[in-house]
């Protein structure tokens, strides 16, 4: 039996506001020959492009299993926070340039994955923000997916236990 050595690396890049309170995009690339995805979630929880939180790990692992090699992680709200406080003024939660980063990322990708789960069902403020964003994302509806488990067509967040190790990507339209 012979031994095989494999090497790999993940290139990280992030764009922040000048005061590091908002993150607009986090890019991760591990194989530039493979497909690209944009994953849209609710808010970033770290300002360190090298820190891998559980959500980012699950996104990378599941996309890699689905033969992707690149992801742009973007969020509906750009404020970096461990827990989203919806009592904060909308202008403090999301900077004006955030949607521009989302739209530019969507123009250069193979798949746009809506990964916010079902939060809009419990929060009217988030539902309104997502509705505004979805209007802007209309040109990309042909490559728009939600994360589902193997048993349902219910939208899931990457941290949902039922999709922790396998994503079933279902077309939105």
Residue ranges and their predicted role:
Residues 1-53:
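Active-site and ligand/interface coordination hotspots across diverse enzymes
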Residues 24, 53-60, 91-100:
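Short acidic (Asp/Glu) patches
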Residues 36, 69-70, 111, 143:
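Residues at the starts of beta-strands that form the adenosine-phosphate
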Residues 45-67:
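A short mixed-secondary-structure module that forms the rim of ligand-binding clefts
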Residues 46, 80, 120:
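Feature marks short, surface-exposed loop/turn motifs that line or immediately flank catalytic pockets
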Residues 69-85:
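Short connector loops at secondary-structure junctions
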Residues 87-173:
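Glycine/proline-rich loop-helix segments at beta-alpha junctions forming the active-site rim
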């Amino acid at each position: 039996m012979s031994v095989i050595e494999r090497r790999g690396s993940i290139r990280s890049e992030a764009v922040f506001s000048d005061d590091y309170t908002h993150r607009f995009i986090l890019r991760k690339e591990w194989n530039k020959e493979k497909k690209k995805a944009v994953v849209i979630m609710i808010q970033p929880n770290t300002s360190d492009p090298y820190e891998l939180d559980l959500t980012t790990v699950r996104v990378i692992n599941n996309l890699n299993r689905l033969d992707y090699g690149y992801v742009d992680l973007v969020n509906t709200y750009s404020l970096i926070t461990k827990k989203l406080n919806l009592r904060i003024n909308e202008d403090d939660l999301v900077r004006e340039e955030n949607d521009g980063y989302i739209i530019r990322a969507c123009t250069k990708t193979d798949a746009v994955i809506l990964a916010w789960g079902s939060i809009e069902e419990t929060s009217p403020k988030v539902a309104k923000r997502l509705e505004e964003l979805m209007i802007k994302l209309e040109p990309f509806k042909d490559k728009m997916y939600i994360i589902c488990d193997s048993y349902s067509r219910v939208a899931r967040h990457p941290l949902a236990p039922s999709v922790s190790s396998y994503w079933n990507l279902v077309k939105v339209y």
